[in-house]
C-alpha cells in the first residue's frame, strides 16, 4: 500500500511538472505572437492577446493605462512613429504564480520615436502577467521597467 502511494505521488508530481512545462511553452508562444503583432503594428492581433477587462493594466512612461481599449488607443498612437521591440529570448523566464497565472520576464530593446524623428534604443526589463482563460492565455498586465545602461 505504501509503495502504491509513493508511485501515485511520483506520477502526480511528474504530471504537474509536465503541465508547468506545457504552460511555460504556451506563455512563451503568446509572447512571440505579441512581439510579432507589435512589430507589425497590428492592433487587432495585439488586442486579441490582451485580456478584455477594465482591470488590464499597462504602465507606460510612469503612467497607468487601465483597460484593453485604452491600451489599444495608446498603441495606435505609438504606431504612427517608430515602435518595435527586440526581446532577448535567451534570458526569458516564465514563473507560474498559481495554476493558470504566469509571470513572464524578458529584457527587451525598444526602438521608439514619434513620426519623422530618429528612434533611439531604450532597454527595459519587461514583465507581463498572463492569465489562462477559456480562449487561451491572455496578457493581463504589461510592466516595463527601465534597465540600467551597460
PLM features per residue range, with description:
Residues 1-8:
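Bacterial N-terminal signal peptides that target proteins for export
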Residues 11-12, 16-49, 150:
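Short, low-complexity N-terminal intrinsically disordered segments enriched in polar/charged residues
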Residues 25, 43-97, 121:
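A solvent-exposed, acidic/Ser-Thr-rich amphipathic alpha-helical stretch
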Residues 82, 110-120, 148:
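Short, cysteine-centered beta-strand-loop-beta hairpins and adjacent loop/turn segments enriched
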Residues 87-89, 105-107, 120-127:
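Short, surface-exposed coil-to-beta transition loops
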Residues 94-102, 130-136:
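A short, structured loop/turn motif at beta-sheet edges
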Residues 100-110:
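A short hydrophobic beta-strand element
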Residues 123-150:
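Short beta-strand edge/turn micro-motifs at domain boundaries
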Amino acid at each position: 500500500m505504501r509503495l502504491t502511494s509513493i508511485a501515485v505521488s511520483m506520477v502526480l508530481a511528474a504530471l504537474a511538472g509536465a503541465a508547468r512545462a506545457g504552460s511555460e511553452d504556451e506563455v512563451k508562444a503568446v509572447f512571440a505572437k505579441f512581439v510579432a503583432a507589435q512589430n507589425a503594428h497590428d492592433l487587432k492581433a495585439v488586442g486579441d492577446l490582451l485580456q478584455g477587462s477594465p482591470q488590464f493594466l499597462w504602465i507606460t512612461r510612469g503612467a497607468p493605462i487601465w483597460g484593453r481599449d485604452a491600451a489599444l488607443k495608446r498603441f495606435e498612437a505609438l504606431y504612427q512613429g517608430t515602435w518595435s521591440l527586440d526581446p532577448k529570448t535567451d534570458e526569458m523566464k516564465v514563473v507560474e504564480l498559481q495554476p493558470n497565472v504566469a509571470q513572464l520576464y524578458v529584457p527587451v530593446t525598444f526602438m521608439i520615436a514619434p513620426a519623422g524623428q530618429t528612434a533611439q534604443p531604450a532597454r527595459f526589463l519587461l514583465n507581463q502577467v498572463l492569465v489562462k482563460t477559456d480562449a487561451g492565455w491572455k496578457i493581463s498586465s504589461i510592466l516595463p521597467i527601465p534597465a540600467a545602461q551597460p
